[in-house]
């Protein structure tokens, strides 16, 4: 069994125990998953909203833990909840009336960040949202294509296609940027 499969089994056991009321298991489950949940939400939404969205994800998960049966891995289950939280937030923001932007409220990037990290984030942000999501789940968070399909609610072939197209898009963007510089 791979390290990832062992870790997923451990997380699932923790979630099942937490669902039965084991507070120590709940604490261990949250600690073990919070980094992946935050990173996933930061890429789906924005880093500034990731804390609030992660909190909402865990609130929803806590309410649902007693009904979690372990048919999928707990990590897949939790990331599917995070995905729904992000989608709900986008729907909420689109439904709100647009008001003039206060320049002081605009999130300013931190100075001193490495150019490559900034460039990568710009390139990721330029991807189609479904392609970005599939790429992040498989390449950054390390989910299998099957697990990613479960999180996204689509066939595994669609996930493979989205990841392949995301890679092509990133490579094409990188080549264009190189040609502009050189």
Regions found by a protein language model. Give the residues of each.
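C-terminal edge and immediately downstream basic/flexible tail or linker adjoining helix-turn-helix-like DNA-binding
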Residues: 2-5, 17, 45, 122, ...
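Arg/Lys-rich amphipathic alpha helix in sigma70-family domain 2
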Residues: 63-70, 80-101, 113, 165
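Structural recognition of an alpha-helix C-terminal capping motif at a helix-to-coil junction
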Residues: 52-59, 72-84
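DNA-recognition helix of helix-turn-helix
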Residues: 83, 87, 140, 152-177
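Short, charged helix-capping/linker segments at alpha-helix termini
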Residues: 2-4, 19-28, 38-56
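Internal acidic/polar
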Residues: 4-11, 88, 94-122, 144
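Amphipathic, Lys/Arg- and hydrophobic-enriched alpha-helical face
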Residues: 30-48, 64, 124, 176
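Helix-turn-helix DNA-binding module
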Residues: 125-133, 141-158
């Amino acid at each position: 069994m791979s390290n990832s499969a062992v870790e997923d089994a451990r997380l699932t056991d923790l979630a099942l125990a937490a669902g039965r009321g084991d507070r120590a298991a709940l604490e261990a489950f949250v600690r073990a998953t919070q980094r992946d949940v935050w990173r996933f939400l930061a890429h789906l939404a924005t880093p500034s909203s990731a804390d609030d969205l992660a909190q909402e994800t865990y609130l929803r998960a806590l309410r649902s833990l007693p009904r979690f049966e372990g048919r999928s891995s707990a990590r897949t289950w939790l990331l599917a909840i995070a995905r729904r939280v992000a989608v709900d937030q986008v729907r909420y923001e689109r439904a709100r009336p647009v008001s003039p932007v206060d320049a002081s409220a605009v999130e300013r990037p931190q100075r001193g960040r490495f150019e490559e990290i900034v460039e990568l984030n710009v390139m990721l942000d330029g991807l189609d949202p479904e392609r970005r999501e599939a790429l992040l789940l498989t390449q950054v968070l390390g989910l299998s294509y099957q697990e990613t399909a479960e999180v996204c609610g689509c066939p595994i072939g669609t996930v493979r296609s989205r990841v392949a197209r995301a890679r092509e898009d990133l490579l094409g963007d990188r080549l264009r940027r190189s040609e502009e510089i050189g």
